[in-house]
Amino acid sequence: MNFPRIVIAGISSSSGKTTISSGITAALTKRGHKVAAYKCGPDYIDPGYLTLAADNPCHNLDSWMLGKDAMTEVFFHGLKNREIALVEGVMGLYDGYSGERPGGSTAEIARLLSAPVILLLNISHMAESAAAIVLGYKNLDPRINIAGVILNQAGSLRHYEICRKAIEKYTSTPVVGYLLRNKELAIPERHLGLKTTSEGGELASFIQNLAAHIESTIDIDRILNIARNAPPLPERPCPYLFPETPARPVTRIAIARDEAFSFYYQANLDMLSDWGAELCYFSPVHDTCLPENIGGIYIGGGFPEIMAAELSANQAMKTALTKAAEDGMPIYAECGGLMYLSEAIEDFDNNKYLMLGLLPGVSVMQKKLHRLGYTRAAVQNDNILSGKGTELRGHIFHWSKLPSPKTKPAYTLLEPAEYAGQNEGFIIGNSTNVLASYLHLHFGTNPDLAKNFIRVSKGFYAI
């Protein structure tokens, strides 16, 4: 199967991947192309920009969490009704799980998808030396097809031309465009990285302005040509994560989505929907009641610490969620969702805001990142998503700390080594119907996660 596709990779973090990937995606969309957008790795924020730019949900591709077949299935799933795929890389091109185990790198994903790569290079502090960097990236792994280069943070057109000529002379790799230094093109950041698209503001106009800049200095037609000359796609895996025909809805699951909670893998939502859950959305910040006739609740991660005052003040929603938990409704809360279920959130300025109180203890924001990285875990006790002994892969990234309450633990961490043996996650409620954890799970690691959540939700309310 032939399908145009391109990977936008950087030589490091902060090389401009999200800015340029979003701009190219928006430029292609503006021209009428239906773009399937993807983000390598476990990040939640960058996909929001790509979703906005493509006007279509972005999927995460993670070969460490999912493995080759599941990751490839997610890729094919995202191609439906699209005509070109754009994949934004993660960190530097070759950065993966570790030096000895390079799984999860942009290079590995590009290789598994047989996709050509456009390499981004920040040239703000170099000239001809840019050629040496590109040459090194090309020679490190000849299996990776670096088909073009984009130069970011050029000081002037003359600066760009010096770098372009050197790269094309010494590497025979075409330079397909550049961006000048321009603070107006910088995406705002906060403690978890870039600001999320769910926080509102003028992001739609920002994306369109970005697309206009991209079109003026980057050769979109040349990028299209590179994408169209990609080799045939690898064989499509047999359906495993998604049913060939979506199941009839058997229950309704409410998804918390607003400025406070927006961290969801699109595949998680699609798997729930395709395996039999009708999804409905609500806002813990703005709504005063839960959607009617629901069998389960999913509260993802996000920035509850930024919206803590508003969450705390919405007593009607807190009461509704507490009652749902006490009534035995299945509730799954990840990271920011876990913080919302705790007694209170203490923000960076030591202000304390009361939350639901389903989970004993106060979630306290730390001055530095508390835990970060890929994680393997074994299920320690049966819960609404998985049975005892199941091994899961996920990702942890949080600045808050919650003293371990005396509740039943959900998981035992196996990896990385510094966390091995630690308990993670909490099972709460008289009927153990609430699961809260800092561990972000991609349901593609095990489709039974989605199926089990649907099963227990149907047990509470069936359509």
From Swiss-Prot:
Name of protein: Cobyrinate a,c-diamide synthase
Function: Catalyzes the ATP-dependent amidation of the two carboxylate groups at positions a and c of cobyrinate, using either L-glutamine or ammonia as the nitrogen source.
Domain-level remarks: Comprises of two domains. The C-terminal domain contains the binding site for glutamine and catalyzes the hydrolysis of this substrate to glutamate and ammonia. The N-terminal domain is anticipated to bind ATP and cobyrinate and catalyzes the ultimate synthesis of the diamide product. The ammonia produced via the glutaminase domain is probably translocated to the adjacent domain via a molecular tunnel, where it reacts with an activated intermediate.
Leftover remarks: The a and c carboxylates of cobyrinate are activated for nucleophilic attack via formation of a phosphorylated intermediate by ATP. CbiA catalyzes first the amidation of the c-carboxylate, and then that of the a-carboxylate.
Enzyme class, first EC level, given as a word: ligase
Residue intervals of the GATase cobBQ-type domain: 252-448
Residues marked Increases nucleophilicity of active site Cys (site): H440
Source organism of the structure: Dehalococcoides mccartyi (strain ATCC BAA-2266 / KCTC 15142 / 195) (Dehalococcoides ethenogenes (strain 195))
Catalytic activity: cob(II)yrinate + 2 L-glutamine + 2 ATP + 2 H2O = cob(II)yrinate a,c diamide + 2 L-glutamate + 2 ADP + 2 phosphate + 2 H(+)
Positions of the catalytic residues: C335 (nucleophile)
GO molecular function terms listed in the Swiss-Prot or TrEMBL record: ATP binding; cobyrinic acid a,c-diamide synthase activity
SUPFAM superfamilies given in the database record: Class I glutamine amidotransferase-like, P-loop containing nucleoside triphosphate hydrolases
EC number: 6.3.5.11
Biological process per Gene Ontology, one example term: cobalamin biosynthetic process
Keywords, alphabetical: ATP-binding, Glutamine amidotransferase, Ligase, Magnesium, Nucleotide-binding
Cofactor(s) this protein requires: Mg(2+)
Pfam families assigned: CbiA, GATase_3
Family, per entry: Belongs to the CobB/CbiA family.
